[in-house]
């Protein structure tokens, strides 16, 4: 029998620091919001998300592992995620108004930090508008 040749490639997963409104971060940390929604997909493969609670809190409060990333029309993604979206249908469709693509990060292994951290702990001097890569 001839031996099979193959190439094994490790897919490197990046960590993303995501700026999120404090109330939505709280829903994630409480387990009420299982998906984080975005309008576009980053270029890098994301394996972990660090949560920065934006103003007025302005602290890094937790993290989660990304189980999977869903991409599709806003209507398709809502039909899959609505039961654990942690946001209202009106808010969701308002967010995606005029957009043809929706991205949803399914979160698992969510951790709330016992002591919130500063952005400077991650070598970051300014809060990201949306997100930044940490590695």
Cite the ranges covered by each PLM segment:
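Contiguous surface segments at macromolecular interaction interfaces
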Residues: 2-45, 58-61, 69-135
